[in-house]
C-alpha cells in the first residue's frame, strides 16, 4: 500500500512540474517579440512606443519593454537586440525622452536557459524511462498490459462441488478422474500413466460447462486460475502472447494447479481462416498458447481446462493429444438428467404436493440445465405474483408456457371471425394428433396469442426418442397439416396461419428424401452439409451432388409425401367432424383445454362436462393442499428436505 502511495505521489509531482514549466515557457515565449531588429527598434523609439531600455554591459545586448498599448501591434511586450551601447545610442534615446539603464550581464543566464529550454525535455525522457521500468517491473504497476488477468479462486470463495452438478454423469466421471489424479498421482503414475495436460469441455450453451469447471475447482483442493478467452487479446500488439506466458508462469509457480479458459474459441480459432494472415494478434496469442501447452519447455503439473460451444472452429493443433488429451462432451440432459437438475434447483423452493418433477421433465425436451434453472425461477416469480406460500404445478405450467411460447398477449384485439378460425385450426391439429398412432400425446391446446403465434397445440413426449421412424415422420407431417385441413374443410378457404406448419412439414419431407433415404429414390444422401471455416465462422452450407433430372425426381417425391400427409388430415377430420366441432366450441368457451379434457371431448363428452371436471379437480386439489398443510403444521409443503424423484 505504501509503495503504491509513493508511486502515485511521484507521478502527481512530475505531472504538476511538467505542466508548470510548460506554461511558464509558453508564457515567456508568447510575451517576447519575434523578428525584432535594430532598425525596428530605432523606428519604435522615434514613434514613442518604447517604455524602457536597458544596456547590458560586457555585451552588445539591448533589452527593453514596449508600452502596454502597443502590445497587440508587436504581438508582445519584451524585446532583445544587439545594438550600440556607446554615447551615440545614449544620446539618441535621450533625444526621444528615454533614459536607458545599465546592468552587468546576468551570470545565471546559463542556468535559466537550461531550466527553461532543457528541463521539459529532461522530464519527458525521465517519464519515459520510468514508464518502461514500470512495465518491466510487472504486476500492479502502471502500463502492465502484458500481465495475465487470470483470477485465482480460493477454496472458500463460491465453492461448488460435484454434488451440485446433475444431469451430466459421464462428464462428471471424466473430471472426477482429473481430481483424483491431482489428489493421488502415484495411483496412476506407478502403472505408467501420465496426467492429461488438457481437458476440453464441448457442449451447447447452458449445458453446465462452466459449472463443471467450478466443481473441479471446489473438489481438487489445488490453486485454480480462471480466465476468459477474450481477456488475452487487446488493442496492443504482443499483449496476448505476453499474457499467455505470464499465465503459465503463475501456473508453474503454483503447480500442481488448474487453469480454466472459458470460451476458448475467442483465441483458439483456426489459423489462416480470417483476415490479417499469420501475423494478426489473435494468431500470435494462439501460437504462444500452443508452445506453452506442449513445447520445448513442458508445463508439468499445470492442467488446462477449456470450454467452448464451437469446437468446429478450433485449430487442429490445439486439439491434438499432448495439448487437449481429453475431450468431454457435455450434452443436453435426457429425461433422467432433467429430473435430477430440477431436483437440485427445487431444493431452494417450497413446493406443493401436486408438483411432479418427472412430469415437468417430460414436458421440457431439449431444455439445457440453464433453461431448467430459469424455468424454476420463473415459476417462483409466477407464484410470488399470486401471493402463494409455495409453488404449485400450475405455476410450473405457466412458467413453461412463457419460456417456450412467450408471454400471453391478452390485450391483443382479435375479431370473433379470426378467433373462430384459430379455434378450428388448433382443433384440427389436436384431432389429427389424437387419431394418429405413434405421435406424442396432446398436453395442452390454447387459442390465447403467445409470442408470434395466435394459438398453440402442445404435445408432451412420453419417453426420450433418439431416432425417428418413417411412419412417425409421415404422421408428423399429417399432424402439421391438421390446422390447414380444418380451415379448408370448414370455411372452404385457407389463411396464412398455416405458414409455419407448411415450412416445418416441407423440411421434414425434404430430409426424408435427401438425407434419410425414406423414399423410392433409395438410401442415398443427395445433400451433404459442408462446414467451411471462413473468417473464424462455420457456415452450414449444403452442397447439391445430383443432376437437374434427379432434382426433378426429388421434388416429385417431396410433393408425394406432402400430399399424402395432407390427404390423411382431411380424411380424419371428415370422419370425425363432430369431435372437431366439440373441440372448437370448448376452445371458444374456455380458450385453453388440457390433455385430459381433449380426451373427454374426442371420446364424445359434451362441452358442458368440462366445467364439471374442472370444479371436481379444483375441489380435489384444495382438499389435498389443506391436508398437506395440516400435516405440516402450516409449514410450506415440500420445504422440509430435498426433492425426491
UniProtKB/Swiss-Prot annotation:
Enzyme Commission code(s) on record: 3.4.24.-
Stretches in topological domain Periplasmic: 28-110
Record localization: Cell inner membrane
Cytoplasmic face of the membrane: 1-6, 132-645
Cofactor: Zn(2+)
Pfam families to which the protein is assigned, alphabetical: AAA, AAA_lid_3, FtsH_ext, Peptidase_M41
GO CC field: plasma membrane
Cofactor: how bound: Binds 1 zinc ion per subunit.
GO biological process terms held by the UniProt record: protein catabolic process; proteolysis
Residues spanning the membrane: 7-27, 111-131
Residues making up the signal peptide according to the UniProt record: none
InterPro entries (UniProt xref): AAA+_ATPase, AAA_lid_3, ATPase_AAA_core, ATPase_AAA_CS, FtsH, P-loop_NTPase, Pept_M41_FtsH_extracell, Peptidase_M41
Positions that bind Zn(2+): 425, 429, 501
Topology of the protein relative to the lipid bilayer: Multi-pass membrane protein
Keywords annotated in UniProt: ATP-binding, Cell inner membrane, Cell membrane, Hydrolase, Membrane, Metal-binding, Metalloprotease, Nucleotide-binding, Protease, Transmembrane, Transmembrane helix, Zinc
Positions of ATP binding: 203-210
Top EC class of this enzyme: hydrolase
Entry-linked CDD domains: RecA-like_FtsH
Active site residues according to the UniProt entry: 426
Recorded family membership: In the central section; belongs to the AAA ATPase family.
NCBIfam families in the record: FtsH_fam (TIGR01241)
General function of this protein: Acts as a processive, ATP-dependent zinc metallopeptidase for both cytoplasmic and membrane proteins. Plays a role in the quality control of integral membrane proteins.
The protein, known as: ATP-dependent zinc metalloprotease FtsH 1
Organism per entry: Bdellovibrio bacteriovorus (strain ATCC 15356 / DSM 50701 / NCIMB 9529 / HD100)
